[in-house]
Amino acid sequence: MKKISSLLMAVAAMFMVSCGGNAQKAAPAEEAAAKLPVGVQLYSVRGDMEADFKGTLQKVKAMGYDGVEFAGLFNNDPAQVNAWCKEIGLEPISAHVPLADMLADIDKVIADYKAVGCTYIVVPYVTEERRPGGELFLQMVEEIRTIGQKCKEAGLTLLYHNHDFEFKKLESGEYGLDYLYSNVPADLLQTELDECWVKYSGLNPAEYLLKYSGRSPVVHLKDYHLEGEMEGDPYALIGLNEGEEKKSSAFEFRPLGKGLQDVPSIIEAAHQAGSKWLIVEQDEPSMGLEPMQCIQTSIEYLKSIGAK
């Protein structure tokens, strides 16, 4: 009996060790499953896209990106773009489309990007008169409601991509961005928080993302560097206003991990908020790097912290 008992105990011990070993081997797979897929906003490499659309997509995939967010199709046929994405293995996540284009012909915008295979259409930027405090701000809110309804009916989801000017407070004391989200239902409009501009506006990016838990399917990861206090219009200083050349300034977009952002805290908040995609964006190259080198640096950083 003692021999049998000893044998049973030995077998049990071996079984427990075996289970423990399997559990240890399973951990990396579980961690991998928990990682959010990472895309890139192709505005970051717009010159490369214009010069070689398909070739740039192939390079983006080779870097390790899972999907892309478009900023124009550069006269390529939407169905062809969809075919290229399938061939290369990139998810066509979303597209930034000027609000003016949506207002002019939302049916065409929807048809084009459904053909591309996008899940989301994004309002990327609004002109001054449609910003909080502008004469057309309230009209813009209603325009977005209408566009959101059209997108919903077509099986797409409308997102709004913020800058810093949406954090101007209205007479009520409410931020313009919060007013937009409180006045357009979540089933018609979701967030695409650009965390660079959230931080630049003086808010905590992770905390603000958590405020919109369940309504933030796509998050823009963007880093920047700032020397001292910014004075004047940041878009003039970085040369993003139409017709203006870039001026020397204290503000500079940076690859992820090279600026002021606490990127890990944003990624953790994205998990908690139920986000589905992280999207890398860098409006202008910096640090002596070319645009493609910048997005390469960003994804290598994400790999280094275990987020990719």
Where are these regions (language model features)?
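N-terminal pre-domain/capping segments
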Residues: 4-8, 19-120, 190, 296-308
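Acidic-and-aromatic substrate-binding clefts and catalytic sites of carbohydrate-active enzymes
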Residues: 45-51, 67-79, 97-106, 128-132, ...
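Alpha-helical scaffolding segments of alpha/beta enzyme cores, especially the outer helices
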Residues: 55-59, 79-83, 87, 108-111, ...
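Conserved beta-strand positions in the central sheet of alpha/beta enzyme cores
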Residues: 69, 94, 122, 159, ...
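Active-site acidic/histidine proton-transfer and metal-coordination neighborhood
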Residues: 99-191, 292
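Acidic/histidine-rich catalytic cores of soluble enzymes
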Residues: 153-254
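C-terminal/domain-terminus segments
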Residues: 277-304
